[in-house]
Amino acid sequence: MATKKAGGSSRNGRDSAGRRLGVKKADGQYVIPGNIIVRQRGTKIHPGTNVGLGKDHTIFALIEGRVEFLTKRNHKIVNVKEIASTY
């Protein structure tokens, strides 16, 4: 005879991998067209000048330049500032 009753099965034992969201390029960092600046769910950070917005709300650079984060009317905005030509 078994001395222990059958144990119940747990319904919770699993976890999904992190989605690697967040800011990928910091303020003042150099970017080229196509570089991802922010990966996010929804528009926590809004696109400004010289940046594009992907269908999954990813913000990416459209031109070569430096990243600039700012807050306007309680909205975080990211821009890419063009670097002045040196020649």
Swiss-Prot record:
Protein's GO biological process: translation
Disulfide-bond pairs as recorded: none
NCBIfam families with a match to the protein in the record: L27
Taxonomic lineage of the native organism: Bacteria, Pseudomonadati, Pseudomonadota, Alphaproteobacteria, Rickettsiales
Family classification: Belongs to the bacterial ribosomal protein bL27 family.
Ribosomal protein is among the record's keywords: yes
Protein's name in the database: Large ribosomal subunit protein bL27
Span list, region Disordered: 1-24
